[in-house]
């Protein structure tokens, strides 16, 4: 049996941006559901954070969520299992009140949809899989006990595990220890949007780009085979963020007249100016770029020739925002718990980068 695994869909991201809803819809209409149809996949498991806002949902977002996700699952007769993530709950100390419970209980197709705010071992065609929702202070002991008691060798969850990258180049320095998952052959998790693997634990990553931190970081969904235990990655070809290097040295103006800018429509574009020797050519380039109707264009003069460095080198040489904040906290003189302050700052930062101003 093959299961489609998807996680961190964050319906309503960037302050319920219509542009991002359109971007999400394109992925579902042209990539996700066509793949399920072609391969006859009738079971989908969502590993948490199906919505973005913790305390409410915008009516426009809800309408699009139902039309492009729920009803598409329903008309295909797909069995849908969703694990509650931290963005699906309004409170930090309980999962009992959650978006899935409130939304799915009012939908006629709810008999084909199962949501899990408590741990549960589910059998998928002979393969036991432990489904683990977000772990908080109140359910920590019960969650650990459920992991120890489950006969499953495979675990799907929404975990915050120490040592994994939250986004590319930004490592999480707190959370669950990896050794508590040692009894499982395989653990697949949502929560961190960067796709990564260490040992028996794999973060699946989000299906699409939502911030500049996601730039050039592969996004998509996965297919898990319950018989072979193999995982296949299906990449999303559509991107929201682009970097364009401008260098008109040795180029004729005619080249800029022939350039195709259509791929930048409804996306964010960062133009890195390496060499600008012909002002007319540069203006022509920008005019044609703006005619493609991007959401936003930012222009950066490249004094350090960043285009000649791999992205990995740029990330390693530059301190990310969270590292700067963490160092600031460590140098402060105060009586409080610095670890808790770091967590608070990280949460505030994550909220900020997901807002559409």
PLM features: residue spans?
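Conserved catalytic scaffold of divalent metal-dependent phosphoesterases
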Residues: 88-179
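Conserved beta-sheet core of the metallophosphoesterase superfamily
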Residues: 167-233
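Divalent metal-coordination and catalytic microenvironments
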Residues: 8, 28, 44, 49, ...
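Short, conserved loop/helix-junction motifs that constitute active-site signature segments
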Residues: 73-76, 146-149, 178-183, 262-264, ...
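Accessory, non-catalytic peripheral segments of nucleic-acid enzymes
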Residues: 226-357
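Core catalytic region of metal-dependent phosphoesterases/phosphodiesterases
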Residues: 9, 13-120, 180-184
């Amino acid at each position: 049996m093959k299961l489609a695994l998807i996680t961190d869909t964050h319906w309503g991201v960037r302050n319920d941006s219509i542009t991002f809803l359109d971007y999400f819809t394109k992925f579902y209409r042209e990539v996700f559901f066509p793949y399920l149809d072609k391969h006859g996949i009738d079971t989908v498991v969502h590993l948490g954070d199906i919505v973005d806002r913790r305390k409410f949902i915008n009516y426009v977002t809800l309408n699009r969520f139902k039309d492009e996700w729920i009803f598409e699952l329903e008309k295909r007769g797909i069995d849908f299992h969703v694990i509650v993530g931290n963005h699906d709950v309004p409170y930090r100390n309980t999962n009992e009140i959650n978006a899935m419970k409130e939304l799915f209980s009012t939908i006629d197709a709810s008999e084909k949809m199962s949501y899990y705010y408590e741990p549960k071992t589910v059998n998928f065609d002979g393969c036991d899989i432990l489904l683990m929702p977000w772990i908080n202070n109140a359910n920590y002991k019960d969650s650990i006990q459920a992991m120890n008691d489950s006969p499953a060798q495979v675990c799907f969850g929404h975990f915050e595990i120490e040592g994994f990258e939250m986004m590319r180049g930004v490592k999480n320095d707190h959370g669950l220890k990896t050794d508590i998952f040692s009894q499982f052959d395989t653990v697949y998790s949502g929560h961190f949007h960067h796709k990564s693997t260490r040992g028996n634990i794999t973060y699946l990553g989000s299906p699409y780009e939502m911030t500049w931190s996601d730039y050039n970081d592969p996004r998509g969904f996965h297919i898990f085979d319950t018989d072979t235990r193999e995982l296949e990655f299906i990449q999303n070809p559509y991107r929201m963020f682009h970097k364009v290097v401008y260098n008109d040295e040795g180029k004729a103006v005619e080249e800029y007249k022939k350039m195709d800018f259509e791929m930048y429509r409804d996306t964010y574009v960062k133009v890195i100016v390496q060499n600008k020797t012909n002002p007319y050519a540069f203006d022509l380039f920008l005019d044609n770029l703006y005619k493609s109707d991007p959401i936003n264009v930012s222009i950066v003069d490249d004094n350090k020739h960043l285009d000649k460095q791999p992205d990995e080198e740029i990330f390693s040489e530059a301190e990310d925002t969270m590292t700067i904040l963490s160092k600031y906290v460590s140098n402060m003189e105060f009586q409080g718990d610095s670890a808790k302050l770091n967590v608070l700052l990280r949460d505030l930062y994550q909220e900020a980068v997901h807002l559409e101003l």
